[in-house]
Amino acid sequence: MKQIHVIDSHTGGEPTRLVMKGFPQLRGRSMAEQRDELRELHDRWRRACLLEPRGNDVLVGALYCPPVSADATCGVIFFNNAGYLNMCGHGTIGLVASLQHMGLITPGVHKIDTPVGQVSATLHEDGAITVANVPSYRYRQQVAVDVPGHGVVRGDIAWGGNWFFLVSEHGQRIELDNREALTEYTWAMLKALETQGVTGENGAPIDHIELFADDPNADSRNFVMCPGKAYDRSPCGTGTSAKLACLAADGKLAEGQTWVQASITGSQFHGRYARDGERIRPFITGRAYMTADSTLLIDEQDPFAWGI
């Protein structure tokens, strides 16, 4: 009987399952190499942890790893129901809150090694967490894509740790009770981007869609479609970073000015940025809450031992 020790949390409604023990040891020299090793040699562990019957499509996994940098607190590899994520803002907040819950860290600045580089997270005395994300930027502006059944849609392509297609003019109602229609619309948009060859820099696939609307209690409300056809319950840390990059490029948000990004569930992140050469360094602040401390069991005789 194999065992996996996990800590579950949610950040703005979006769950994170932090794997503390039980996965195979990884030997790569960088977090990117370790992610690739996990994907190529041990992917069944991701499936067992996140897919039914132990998980669900909404869960985002975070594998706690020893740091690869001398000044880092830890390393992390993020994954979901469909595969692996480059970076995850809400997951980083969940990671830091979980480590505090277990008594492994105290308030202060903690550096974290990820597959796309080192980020830092500040655990504040009041429990809020600010992630200094990877340098972010807008790659292309107002790119047209023909979405079958919906016509031509224009959006910006931006990097915030993942590749996003950001759309403000879409004609959709961004409300929680409209989530099924929004899911189908944004999934069709993702597929249209793929079939029409619209990509991020160097042909990188765009795997997130972000729609925006007005919100009475924030600067903006979003709906974020993630790979695997699950929408983000939080405002999305990497998506908010991509939004900040677009706002900075358009001259609509000054350096250091706060942007309040609401999600479709009403949760909020507070974002700001600092200039970093031709890119920006986003700072995303949010909170996470613990929901479970569990041991997952894998019985080799179970026909669904490694997920459905």
Swiss-Prot record:
The active site is at C88 (proton acceptor), C236 (proton donor). Belongs to the proline racemase family. One of its GO terms (molecular function) is 4-hydroxyproline epimerase activity. This is 4-hydroxyproline 2-epimerase. SUPFAM superfamilies: Diaminopimelate epimerase-like (SSF54506). Keywords: Isomerase. It comes from the Bacteria. Its EC number is 5.1.1.8. The lineage of its organism: Bacteria, Pseudomonadati, Pseudomonadota, Gammaproteobacteria, Pseudomonadales. Substrate binds at G89, H90, H208, D232, G237, T238.
